[in-house]
Amino acid sequence: MPRKHLIASQTNKKQQSNAKQLQKLAKRIAAAVKKGGSNIDANPQLKVAVELALAHGLSADSIKRNIHGSEKDPTKLSEFCYEIFGPNGVGIIVFGLTDNPNRLLSSLNGYIAKLKAQLAKPNSVKINFEEKGIALVKHNNFTQDELIELLISNNINLLDLNEDDDSFEVVVDSPSYFALKDLLVKNSFTIEASELRLIPLLTVELNAEQHTLLNRFLNACEEDDDIQTVVHNAL
């Protein structure tokens, strides 16, 4: 199945407990509500957070309670993005969401030291990534050419389209992501998975020792409540 983008290394989600993941997603929903309000249709960050929460099994009722509770919760949550150069120049981006920025930075500095890495200047790592929207969908009796025609005729900026026996992997630019999903639903496609994701424009090879260091770093980040996601471009 054409999952080369959907399974690209970002966070080691398979190793992360579902409870921990749901806790982080609930925090992400709360931050989105505080920043842009509780109207999902008018708040893109909240829309993405809710999509992810539903995909990870959080019930619609739990999400509604979280949204309503977040409107009344006085806790201030701050978003942070740290860029890092790791072993052999591998680029790493850490997205944090915390009520205690000093705690987050202190913990992250410890993880970076063990990785034998260093903090990078803003955009020195991000420049090597591009945000794209990705959807993995069942064929729904469409040929590849028919799907391409459907997307183009609806002004979807298609970047890539992969196909196997029963599925398409559709890759679009980030501004087209929600329009793509609406179009797929309207045409009765079964969406198996979808997300907005930073895709590396170039990749870096690591040796076994460097991979071990990187995996330890990723595991530490996964266990840290203040860290939401980690993106890297290691093979």
Swiss-Prot record:
Pfam families for the chain: TACO1_YebC_N, Transcrip_reg
Write out the entry's keywords from A to Z.
Cytoplasm, DNA-binding, Transcription, Transcription regulation
Q: Does the keyword Transcription regulation apply?
A: yes
Statement: the UniProt record of this protein carries the keyword Signal: no
Named from the GO MF annotations, one term is: DNA binding
- Compartments, record wording: Cytoplasm
- GO BP terms, alphabetized: regulation of DNA-templated transcription
Predominant localisation class: cytoplasm
Q: Gene Ontology cellular component?
A: cytosol
Recorded superkingdom: Bacteria
Family matches, as PANTHER family? TRANSCRIPTIONAL REGULATORY PROTEIN YEBC-RELATED, TRANSLATIONAL ACTIVATOR OF CYTOCHROME C OXIDASE 1
UniProt cross-references to NCBIfam families, sorted A to Z: PRK12378.1 (NF009044), YebC/PmpR family DNA-binding transcriptional regulator (TIGR01033)
The family this protein is said to belong to:
Belongs to the TACO1 family.
Designated name of the protein: Probable transcriptional regulatory protein MPN_478
Lineage runs: Bacteria, Bacillati, Mycoplasmatota, Mycoplasmoidales, Mycoplasmoidaceae
